[in-house]
From Swiss-Prot:
E.C. numbers: 1.-.-.-
Record SUPFAM superfamilies: NAD(P)-binding Rossmann-fold domains
Signal peptide (UniProt feature, chain positions): none
UniProt cross-references to InterPro entries, sorted A to Z: NAD(P)-bd_dom_sf, SDR_fam, SDR_oxidoreductase
Pathway(s) of this molecule: Secondary metabolite biosynthesis
Protein name: Oxidoreductase calM
UniProt xrefs under Pfam families: adh_short
Induction, per UniProt: Expression is induced in complex medium (Czapek yeast autolysate medium) supporting calbistrin production.
Biotechnology: Calbistrin A has been reported to possess a number of interesting bioactivities including antifungal active against Candida albicans and cytotoxic toward both healthy and leukemic human cells.
Organism of origin: Penicillium decumbens
UniProt keyword NADP, yes or no: yes
Organism lineage string: Eukaryota, Fungi, Dikarya, Ascomycota, Pezizomycotina
Length: 304
């Protein structure tokens, strides 16, 4: 396989950050953290720019933009506005693709409109912003490169009942990001990091979650999705999770520590534990089906 992130990443002292979904939660925490760093510039985006009022209007290093990641014209306009605003100083060093929401409910009841909207925001929105950023980064004459954080989730690795299309969108982010990371020429110095947080204390389970109409066939309390809902509700009531500022601190550390960037970054002990458990089960499953899988054992095989 083509290696990724082969060199240490060095964050410029005057780095420009482009962050999506800055109205609340992780995006807001990252924007606030970047805004507090001397010398750094921030391009903070949200569908409603009035939600960015927490950022200083009088700081020339901060640009607040309206951007809808589901609209290609809106994304293109945001990048052009940033280039026009910063002029000769325009560059994008770090991108944080954070805009997204969860669609939960019984899979049989999800409408075509709901499933497409989920992918437009979580997956295609990430794609649009990433491609525009790569275009800027790979054309730098001094191989300045850049770093792209794509916010996935524990849900991009481990799938749970009642969130099929949310999982599908995050699995898509994971696979697409890894593939694109392997397409980058080492000389471009473009790094990727897929971020996989678990329970963050945001409005993700409230205003950032959309629910489908319930399906009567799945209404029973003994159904897996209903049991998970009960479990999650108890966790929220107990205050389970970590603050968005913790995510912001870690991402800034990854960007600024002058070391190799991890392709995947699970956030929380719970995420590491559940991902480890899934990988162990997958290895066991591979052993179980190894005899069935070896259909090419007597043929020429690719060397990996």
């Amino acid at each position: 396989m083509n290696p990724v992130n082969t060199k240490p990443y060095q964050l410029s002292a005057d780095a420009t950050w482009f962050v999506t979904g800055c109205s609340t939660g992780i995006g807001r925490a990252i924007a606030s953290h970047v805004a507090s760093q001397p010398g750094h510039r921030l391009i903070a985006t949200a569908r409603d720019p009035s939600s960015l009022s927490y950022l200083d209007d009088d700081n020339p290093a901060i640009l607040k933009l309206a951007m809808d990641v589901t609209n290609p014209s809106s994304v293109n306009a945001a990048f052009k506005a940033a280039a026009d605003y910063f002029g000769d100083k325009y560059y994008i060093d770090v991108v944080v693709n954070n805009a997204g929401y969860s669609l939960s409910g019984d899979t049989e009841s999800v409408t075509e409109h709901e499933m497409h909207d989920e992918f437009e925001t979580n997956f295609f929105g990430t794609v649009r912003v990433t491609l525009k950023a790569i275009e800027v980064m790979r054309q730098s004459k001094d191989h300045r490169g850049g770093l792209i954080f794509n916010i996935s989730s524990l849900a991009g690795i481990c799938a749970f009942p009642g969130h099929a299309f949310y999982h599908a969108s995050k699995f898509a982010v994971e696979g697409w990001s890894e593939s694109v990371a392997r397409e980058m020429h080492p000389d471009w110095n473009i790094h990727f990091c897929i971020v996989e947080p678990s329970a963050v204390k945001t409005n993700f389970e409230t205003t950032s979650k959309k629910r489908t109409q319930p399906h009567e066939a799945y209404a029973g309390a003994d159904m897996p999705a209903r049991q998970l809902e009960t479990f999650v509700k108890k966790g929220l009531e107990a205050g389970v999770g970590f603050e968005p500022s913790a995510v912001a601190n870690v991402l800034y550390k990854v960007a600024s520590r002058n070391e190799k960037v991890p392709l995947r970054l699970p956030l929380s002990a719970t995420a590491v534990k559940l991902i480890t458990a899934k990988l162990q089960v997958q290895l066991q499953d591979l052993e179980t089906v190894s005899e069935l899988s070896a259909i090419d054992v007597h043929q020429v095989q690719f060397k990996v």
